[in-house]
Every structure is written in structure tokens, then in C-alpha cells.
Amino acid sequence: MLNIIYVVSLILIKFIFYKECNNNNNNYLSNIELYNYKLRKRNRILNNNINDRKSFLSDLEQNYKPLFDIYELSANFEKRRKELEKKTKGEENEIEKKKENDLEKKKENDLEKEYNDVINLLELSLSSEYKELNADVSNNDNSGHEENNKHKLNKKNSSNYKNDKSLDELIKGAILKLKQNPNIKNKNMLDYDKIFKIIKEKLINKNLASNKIRGGDNEKLKEEKKQSDISTNVEVKKDIINDQLNKGIPTKKENKDDMINKESNKEDITNEGKSNSLNNLNTLNNDGNIITKVYDHYTIVTNSNDILNDISIDASDISKNSIGGINIPFNENDNSSFTHQRYIVLSNNGEKKYKIVLMTKNPKFMDMDGIYDEEEKKESLIELNQKVNKEENTNLYDGTGTLYYGKKSKKEKENTQQKGGNNPNVDINILNNNNNNNNNNNNNNNSNNNSNSMNDEEINYNNNNNNKESPSMFRRFINFLSFSGNENETEDTLIYHNKNDNSYKNKKEGTGKNNDNNDPNNNNNKKILLNVDKLVDQYLLNLKNNHTSKQELILVLKGELDLHSKNMKNVTNNAKKNLEKYFKEHFKEFDKISYDISTPINFLCIFIPTVFDMNNMDLLKQALLILHSDLHEYVENWSFSSTYHTYEADYIKEQDSVYDRSPKKKYIKASKKLYNNKYSFLNKFLNIEPLILFAKKLNSKRSNIEKEILNFLPKELRDYSTWNLSIIRVFNAWFLAGYGNKNVKVCVVDSGADINRVDLNGNLYIPEYNEKYEMTQDFYNFMVKKSYRCLGHGSHVTGIIGGVANDLGVVGVAPNITLISLRFIDGKKYGGSFHAIKALNVCILNKAPIINASWGSSHFDVNLHLTVERLKYTLNGKGSVLIAASGNKSNDNDISPLYPATFTFPHVYSVASISRNFEISPFSNYGYKSVHILAPGHHIYSTIPNNSYKIFTGTSMAAPHVCGVSALVYSVCYNQGFIPQAEEVLDILTRTSIKIISTKKRTINDSLVNAEGAVLTTLLGGLWMQMDCYFVKFNLEKGKKKHIPVVFSAYKKGVYETDIVIAIIPIDGKSKIYGEIHIPIKIVTDVNIPNFQESPRRGKNYTIDSNEAQHDEVLSYICENALYNLYEYDSHYLLASVILFFLALLSIFVGMIYMKSRKHSDKKCSKNLIKSNYIPEMDDGMEETQQLQQERRQYFRELFGENLEKNYDQHFVQDFGQDFRQDFKLGSTPDLKQYSDIDLQNKIQQPERKTVKIIINNFEDRKKETIRRLLKGLNYDGENAKKHDFTNESISNSRKNFKFSNNTEMKKNTIKSEDVKIASDDNVNKAMNQLDDMFMK
């Protein structure tokens, strides 16, 4: 509604200012789209009519080529710099290592010499004292008989203990005296425990040797004494000695730490010295020296001294080297607001003109949860950072993917340990015992094994479950006989389902965040295995719905297990053998059981033959119990495979609103509040400049910028409708960040894709068969090689995501990425969970950060739930994004959920469909708690097999659009050198989306995905830090400077670090000069960090003067019209909307008044134009013409006056023919006698004549005047003509020549709009004038 009022107001304003009267080509409706475009961009019309198109495109490409290629240029430059730095430092490191080795050897020699001197000194000082102490003991030992009784032996041992105690005291006292000796060097470097042991051992050995000379009878006893001295005295009293001896003296470990700290301090000193000087790497490449100059606040890396001399920067207000960091307290309710602002000032002091491009690199986040224990709070942040493991190489898309659980928080690890305990086995053990009691003949061994593992609580719980046995049997029987394959879930069926419902209650309304299911405080978070009865129900239902020879029993094993280890292989083989043995005992025709293992997702699939039915279901229970008894320690859950189907429909020709009963939504432009509203939406929207442009019809250069942008796009976009790409603003996203990056992989788990398609073969990647996939050759071919055997759903979805831009066919959202197509849907549009999990495992192995799932089921599959949960541990803990379609049944997913779209994980994103009218599609599912975002899904044109194209409709078409936008975001991150967190990518999509306001909330965010906003947000810092869109790229001319505002937010609780990189390129295209400015940034949001204090919200005050560099023109247009916003819906927009609404009403009211008055003036203008066109031939000028008109008026008035005596109250009509009118010519006198009654009557009765109808009332007063004038006579020959007097007889004869008819005989429909009604004598003259005008017409 606001949009319509806005457009109408602009049209009226233009109409009011438009003053020309006679313009027949004034078509206002043709400009409606132009006005409409100013408020919103619905349709982009590609224009081919541009003069000198070739030169225009070359200029445009040259102007923006660095913007597209800057990432590759920066990456190559960084790679080359590291190679040169490594090569140069390698030589320096070898020299330094040699020096260090020499120093270490010298230190070791000096230390060893010091040890020897100290030991010799102590040995000399203690030898005499120890001899005196040992003399008494030795005398007591040698006296008496050789054989001593036990009492004497104990007395001897006690004397030895006293001797040892006295010896320890002697050594300790000698060492304490030694420490006070000032002549000994490196006292703190000596290990006094080592000295104590060596001195004591030497003294004891020396004493033993002397005793051995005195007598050999006590040799064995002395050896035992020696061993006891070493093992007992030293070890038992080690703590006591260290407490007394080493009091105030550093230990060996502390000594080593001191050495490390000294070395690190030396390195810091050398680095500080280097930071103030120019570091030249003398290694050359093709472009010259690569120079690194470190300043106090930033670092410049370049291959030219010109950039060092010309460019200067002030980053003292933002760099962590100057301010340490920006401290912002974390607030969960306000983590999306950018509250702190700083500036970077860039100046050009040289003669050259440079092109500047901004980006960010090397982001790092440290989660401080669990790190700050009570003992660690005293440590500084630098010391705590040393405890965090450094991340591996950020290029994680190469190689084989694994699941990395190392980054689990303490809460998650504790919760995982709880899940791995006895809880998963409780339910199974209970049922196991029940079944053993009911089937003693068949299961004696199993009952004995399970009875040992049960406790009293399990037995009591078991008795309570016995009462539920018969109702469950009845329900299973009813479900089996039902026509639908869906089951009614019981209380003990799905613990997961209850957990999902509880997670919704914990979620905050209105936010798009998902709560992690691993909440240890949630009582329902215990993942209990499905019971055997439930598995039997699944088996029977699958048997009824799917006629297959085998059914897949999927067992999800613990994620930390290594399934390829010997232990796990033995466990799996034993379980298989026991199960085969049981089957062979009861089924003679049975051969063997096959199974499938998939890692790293860790699931085991056992193919159970379809030999069971309702008659022998007890045998199936026993088989499941046997399997559980062997694997229950390693299994998290198990269930039979479920069925999934795709979400698409054929082309529908009806209007979008036919079946749409939902409240209408309007497409509005969200507010933008960054940077003190300097570039806010309200200022632009209420600005009068566009109104002036409309009023004056100024065709400025800015009005053609969009045409320039669109003509730079792929040619195939002109061959079909691209409304879906237009409304999500993909074109500007391409213009800013390119078409994507080939290293980014999107895994399409669907019905496969046509390998030979022209639009896909450039991006489609088919994984070669490898043992890492753990598939048989046939199974692999089904999943990948034969993926073209499909009905087109997978090809259609794949084309939407990444159709190649090759001037043929269609173009995808991300035309330059890698697509991995995996088939799990068969030819009937259905697929099982076993194949789905297998496909997801292949995606993990290929390190795909994005997975598309345009399929689902209303049945909750615990195995798929666990599989999707483990996707957050891919890519070294970064996680993979799962984009899922919400469904096509117009249902509320909050009430009737569809999976996997409604899995409540932070890396799962549910997508609904939107139509061209910016309304949720009538077929699309919705849910204000479960559906996250909207995307185009109505009448989408894309690829199908055999190089054909087709229009499909459905949420299956909406999800690929979000996948494509996610791929563009990942591409920007990859270009900047890092891989983002999956949750952060989805938060970027949510916060940059376009708001769709409606009376009823249908999704979590009620917003449309915005490719341009997502790319810009990622390009300029993400959700932690943001720079304005205008500073992505700009030119810095001679003597100019640029103030770059940067805002910060507390997105998460922890410490975030990154580098703002400013790329510098000369405008001269032939130049190979390149440089980068690196500004380190740190944001601290954890208030528990020691000495945390919030930073000021505002930094330094800068003055912007006339030397400020201008924004780039094309980029400014993109930024001003971009629906790019990092905020949620702004309340200030309501005030602006109300003001605009009243202004529009006022404009409409003024316009209506003006148009009404204009209509009257236009009518008068046309009458005057007719008068001016009717000018008879004349010789004597304008005066004679006016005289003729006056004489004619008088003649007709006098002619009709006499006959009105008898018709005072009557209406009369007289018709005059065209020939009679032509007889009245200039310069002649009419002779009324020549008109006979017959001739006049013939002339009057001719039907083709135009008539003038005169209705005359109240002419009684004018009768005498009319007769008088007739008697007086008229002169038609001018001044020199004779006067002709008419007698009464001639006048009466003339009157008889005219026939009057009564007005009552005329029908009402004969009176036309041209009739003249004379109501009184006052307006007779006016009526006669109008009569004369019509008569001339």
C-alpha cells in the first residue's frame, strides 16, 4: 500500500509541474515502472540499446576488474611473500641454529663443570663427618653371632634408619652452606635434588667399600641397605627435603621456564627493534623486492617503494597494537547491534592515483567458556591464549574430511559421556528381560547374560512395563492393517521427538537462532535407544509398503570410535556371526548376512532379510536382542530405514493468488542505522532530490548506472525470466564479489544430475571411486555414476545452485563453484534413510561445507537426526550447513513437522517459497518457530536431463537459492583465507535478509534471502566488525584522504581477532605495483576476563574537509539502493511511513482539485481553438466578420419573436438546413420570399442535416422589441448599401414560411447535450451567443 501511494504521489507531482497544454505524447503510465523502481527493485529489464557497447563494456571491465580479481591477486602475493620469506629466513635460521647449538653446548659444559665442582666440594666436606657417624653403627653390626634373631634384626634396621636420617641432615646442612657461598656461579641453575642423590650415593658406596674390606659377611646386608637408601630414603623423603631444601629456590622446571622467558624476551626485544625499521627481504621476484615495513599500529607489505612513500595511514584509534583491544560486554539480547565506532584515515601524499579495496583476513575466535577456573583467574589473557591450540591450515577443502570432536565445550563433553553410559541400554535391557521371561525355551543363554547386568531399579521398571505389552500389540496390529504407512507414536517411542518439542519452548520468540540439542540441563536430552517393539513395528510397516528382499537396520555408533581398529572389527564380526547362527537355526534356506560400515559418520547398516511377518515376529525380537547384546556398548541408536520424498510440482498456469488464502505481505525497504545515520534509509527516503529529478525530468548519469551493471551480466539472462535472481539481488552480489570460488563445494543430495548437461558439466564434480567411500562398486555407481537416471528433480535443483555462465541456457546463483551430485532418490521420487546417510557421509569425506536437501518426511528418523547433528563437527569443527526445504502441503511445520527441515540445530536452515508478488507461496509450508527464511520457489526455470529446460514450482526450488547465496558467502571467506563457522554463515543470511511485513507472522524472520547484503557483510568484516558499503572500493587521488568508519559488536562471548587489509593498486593498468596494509584488530566480549573494562563507544573526533576523496559512482548506486541491513526491523520506519502516508493523501487531494480545474480550462481552450479555425472568406478584414455575426444574431431574434404570443408556456423546436445557413453571406441581403413552404419543408425534413434545438421560455417581454427591429430593417451590404424596409405584410409572409412544432411531441431522447436552455430574460443574450456558436459549427 505504501508503495502504491508513493508511486501515485510522484506521478501527481510530475503532472502538476508539467505545464504544457497541447502535448499528445504525454503518457504517464509508461513511467510508472521508473517511479516504482526508486522504491523497490522488482524486475530488472536488460537493455541492449547502448551506443558503442564494446568500448563501454571494456571500460566497465577495466574499472572493476581489480574488484573481482583482488582476492586472487592478494592470495598470490601472500603466497609469493611467504615463499621468499621462508627461503630467506631458512638461511638465517641455519646460522642462528648453529649459534644456538654452540651456546647450548657451552652452557651444558659449564653446567656440568659446575656440578662436578659442587659435588667434589660437598664430598670433601662430608666424608670426614660421615665416617665418624658410621663408625658406631658398623661396630654394633659386627658384634654378636652370625645368626641374629628377629629382635636383633629389627634393632639393626632401626639403627640404620637413624643413620640415614642423620646422613640426610648432614647433606642438607652442607648444601645450605654451599648456597651461601658467593664464589659459586649459577646457583639458581643447579638441580639440588640431583646433587643430593649423587652425594648420598657416593658416600654410601664409599662406606660400603670400606665395610667390605673389614668383613665380607655383611655384604648382602649392605647391598640391601644401599637399595633401601636409594629407593626408600630418597623417594619417601623427597617431598620433605624439597620443602626444606628448596625453600625460596627455583626448581628445575622453573629454571627452564626462566630460560624460555629470557629467550622469548630477547626475541621480543629484537622484534621491537625490527618494528621501528624497514625490513627488506633481499630475495627478488619478477616484480622486484617484497618489502615489509612494520609501524606502531599497522604493517605495509608491498613490492614498490612508491606505496611506502605515497600512502600514509592513521590507525591508532583501532589497532590492537595501540589500544590493546576493544572491550564490549556480551549481551545475548543485543548481540546484533553495532555499538562501538572507530575510524581509519587513509591519505595519498604522492603524485599517483591509487585504487583502494577493503577486505578482512585471518579471523580467529577463542571461546573462553570453561577456561577461567578459579585457579586460572589470576593468569593474564596472553597466558590463556597460549593454552588454546592453534588452528590448522585454513584451506580445509582439500583431502579427506573427518569429524573433529576436539572443540567440544566442557558441557558437550560431559553430556557425551552421559550418553555413552548406561542410559542407552536401560530400555533395551528391560525389554530384553521381558522377552527372556516370555520365551525361556528359545533364549536361555541371552536371559542369563542380561540378568547379570540388571539392577533392582531396572527390575522394578520392568514390572511397570509389563502392563503396556498388550496395548502396544494391539496398536501394532492396527497400524499394520491401516492403509497409510504412518504410525501413531507412543510414549516410549521417540525420545528425540519430545526433545525437539522442548527445544522450541526454550527458544526465544522472534529470533532466528536454533538451540543446540546438547543441553545437559534438559532432562529429556537422554538419547535412549528405540525399544524392540518399535523396531518390529518399523519392520512390519516397511514390509507392507516396500516389497524388497532386504531391509536396512541402521545402527549409529559412537562418534569417537575407530571402526577400522582390530577391536571394532572383531566386535562387528562376532555380532554378525551370532546373528547368522540364529538365522540358520530357524530358517534353513538362509545363507548369510551382509552389512555396510560408513566412517567418519560411524554408522553400521545390517541388511535383515524379509523372512518375518506377524506370525514369527517373536523370532525377529530375539534376533534384535542377540544383536544388541553384542553391540549395546558401542551403539547410540538404531532403527530401520525410513522413506523420504522430494518437494516439487509441475508448472501451474493459474494466478498466484487463486489458492492463496493467507494474509498479504508487502515488500518494504528495511531501515539502515549504521554510522550515526549518515547513510540511513530515512534520510534518503525523505530526501527531496528524487522529487526534483522527477519534476524537472533530468536524465542524470546515475539513472543509467543500473543498465550499465545489467549489461555486464551473462547473455543468457536475456533469454528467460530471471525474476528469481533479481529479487534476491544476485546481480549486484556478482558485481561485488564475482561468481564464486571453485574450491567451495556444494553437495546436492537428491535424485542425481545429468553429467552431460551443457549448463552443469563445467561445475559438476563426480567423485572417483575410492575405498574411503566404503561402498561396493555397484553401490557407488548407483549413488554417483548413474546419477543421470532420474526424472529431472536433481538436475533442476543443481542448475539453480550453480548453472554455468557460458552464454548458453541458464545461470545459477553461484555459477563458479563445485557441485557434487549424489543420488539417493529413485525413479519414483522416493529414497531411504540408509542411502541418505550414506550420501551425507560422502559429503563429509569430500569436505563440502554446504549440503542441499530438497526432500523430507513427516516421520522422525533418529538415525538421520544423529547424522545431521554430527555435521557440526566437520571441517575441523567449523561445521557444514544443511539447507532443507520446508514442504509443499501448506501446513504449519510447528504443528506437523517435516524432517530434516525442522531439526533444531544451529547449522540447519529451513526454507519456504515466495512468489513474484512477494507473498509466501500458497503451497509452501510455514512455521514461525521452525521455518527460517523465504526464497523464490514459484515458476522457476532451470535445467532437466537431455539438455532441456523446464519450469518447476515448490520449496525444492527455494532451498537451492539459499544454497547458492551460502556458496557466495563461503567463496568470499575462502578468498580472504579462512573458513567460517556454519552458524555464523546462517546468521549472516538472517540478518541481511529483506523484511516481508504481514499481519500474521508465518516464519521465524519473515524475510527474503538477500545475496547482495550477505556478500557485503562477509566482505566487510562479518558480524563482529562492519565497514560501510561505500568503502569496498574507491579511488584515492593526489592530495586526498579518506575517513573509513568501522563499527563493532559483541556477536559472541569470547575473544575475536582479525586483520583489516587495505589493498592498494595504481590506476595505471600496466603497472605491476601492489601493496597491502594490515591492521590487527581485537574484540574482547567476555566480562570474566581479568581487568575487563568496557571501551568508550566513540573514538577520536575527525574533521572531514574538502580534501575528502569521493565515493565510487557505480558502487555508491549499489550501496544506496541495496536492501542491505544488519539490523532487525526498525520502529522509526513506522513514523516515516505515517508521515509519507499523509503527505501522499495531501498530494492526491491537491492533484484532484488541480485536475478538475484543468479540465474546465482545457474545454475552453478547445472551444477557442474551434472558433479560431472557423474564419469565412472575407475581403475587408476582421471588422466585417464581427459585423456579420452581430447582424445575424439580431436577425434570428427578430425572426422568431412574433410567433411566441400563442405559445407562452410551450417549448418550440425549429430545424434549419445547411443550405439555408449558407445563403447568409457577407455583403448580401437575404430574400425570405424566395423560400416557399414546400421548399423550406423539404430542406427541414432531410435527415442528414444537423439540427439545432432551441428551447425558449418566457419570451413574452421580448416580443415587441423583436418586431420593432424587424420593421426597422437590416443592412447586409455595408455602410453604402440601401436600407430595405419590411412591411407588416412581408413580415407576416416571412413568418408563414416557417413551420413550428410543439415541444411536447418531441421524445426526451432527442434532446442532446448540445441543447441550450434559456431559463429567464437575463441570459437570453448569452443563450443566443451560444446558439450562434453552435450554428457556425
UniProtKB/Swiss-Prot annotation:
Extent of Low complexity compositional bias: 422-470, 513-526
Span of the signal peptide: 1-18
Residues carrying covalently attached carbohydrate according to the record: 157, 335, 445, 449, 488, 546, 570, 637, 724, 816, 852, 888, 946, 1005, 1101
An annotated GO BP: proteolysis
Location(s) in or outside the cell: Cell membrane; Cytoplasmic vesicle, Secretory vesicle, Microneme membrane
Gene3D superfamilies: 3.30.70.2370, Peptidase S8/S53 domain
UniProt-recorded Gene Ontology molecular function terms: serine-type endopeptidase activity
Disulfide bonding pattern of the chain: none
Substrates-to-products reaction catalysed: Hydrolysis of proteins with broad specificity for peptide bonds, and a preference for a large uncharged residue in P1. Hydrolyzes peptide amides
Extracellular side: 683-1132
Top-rank taxon, per record: Eukaryota
Protein function: Serine protease which plays an essential role in the shedding of AMA1, MSP1 and MSP7 from the surface of the invading merozoite; this step is essential for productive invasion and the release of the adhesion between the erythrocyte and the merozoite. May cleave TRAMP/PTTRAMP, thereby shedding TRAMP from the merozoite surface during erythrocyte invasion.
The name this protein goes by in its record: Subtilisin-like protease 2
Naturally occurring in which organism (per UniProt): Plasmodium falciparum (isolate Palo Alto / Uganda)
Gene (name only): SUB2
